[in-house]
Design a protein with these regions (language model features):
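Regulatory linker/N-terminal fringe of the SNARE motif in t-SNAREs
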Residues: 1-19, 23, 27, 33-198
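Juxtamembrane amphipathic/hinge helix adjacent to a transmembrane helix
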Residues: 204-221
């Protein structure tokens, strides 16, 4: 009995640690959004570059936190699979797992939405600078540049024009790199979300199979 008690106490401690890390990730996301607002509203290149570096560092830390939480929830899931539903701790283990999985899913979705909004705003800002370089540019030309930045000869011509155009060109190219980085983060978040939910589906079927096999064995004896 004491072994079961020790086991559930260790499990509850693990749950508390993971829950706190998810909360930390959520706090980071709020700060990342603050950085993004500062970047979009910045009028100083020096300050913007500094804030961008701070944001990138926090994005990296948050990525590591989210991956760690996903991995630790996965381990709990696999442990739960090995416990029969008649175990006295099965209910609380499954309930706590479900709560953590839902909390992490919500944080992943919240973060994905924040990055998606930031990408849209960055594209709007980039489009304004693009039109400084090429005042007659259409939205299609801007979209084409986003898809393939190497295919725009207009920028080679822009280098021969005003200092304003040169500055705008540098701005456009920087925004394009920012957008690619944001897209990468969004893809990572989508992959984490999908993996988390694929694991749940797999686990649910595994539990069903285990219980069906146990019942079949009992009926034969």
């Amino acid at each position: 009995m004491s072994g079961v008690s020790d086991n559930i106490n260790g499990f509850l401690n693990e749950i508390t640690e993971i829950d706190q890390k998810i909360t930390n990730a959520k706090t980071n996301i709020v700060k990342i959004q603050e950085f993004q607002g500062q970047i979009l509203n910045s009028t100083s290149t020096t300050q913007e570059n500094f804030t961008t570096k701070e944001r990138e560092a926090l994005v990296s830390d948050t990525r590591n936190l989210l991956v760690e939480c996903k991995d630790r929830i996965k381990r709990i899931q696999y442990d739960n699979v090995r416990i029969h539903s008649s175990d006295p701790n099965f209910g609380i283990r499954q309930q706590r797992y479900d709560v953590l999985r839902t909390k992490l899913s919500n944080v992943l979705e919240e973060y994905r939405q924040a990055e998606s909004d930031f990408m849209k705003q960055t594209k709007v800002r980039m489009a304004r600078q693009y039109k400084v370089v090429n005042p007659n540019a259409t939205q299609q030309e801007i979209d084409d540049y986003l898809s393939n930045s190497d295919s725009q000869p207009i920028f080679q011509q822009a280098l021969l024009r005003t200092n304003e155009a040169k500055s705008a060109l540098a701005e456009v190219q920087k925004r394009h790199e920012d957008i690619k980085n944001i897209e990468s983060t969004i893809a990572e978040l989508a992959a984490l979300f999908q993996e988390l939910h694929l694991q749940v589906e797999s686990q649910d079927q595994t539990v069903i199979n285990i219980e069906q096999n146990a019942e079949a064995t009992a009926q034969k004896t």
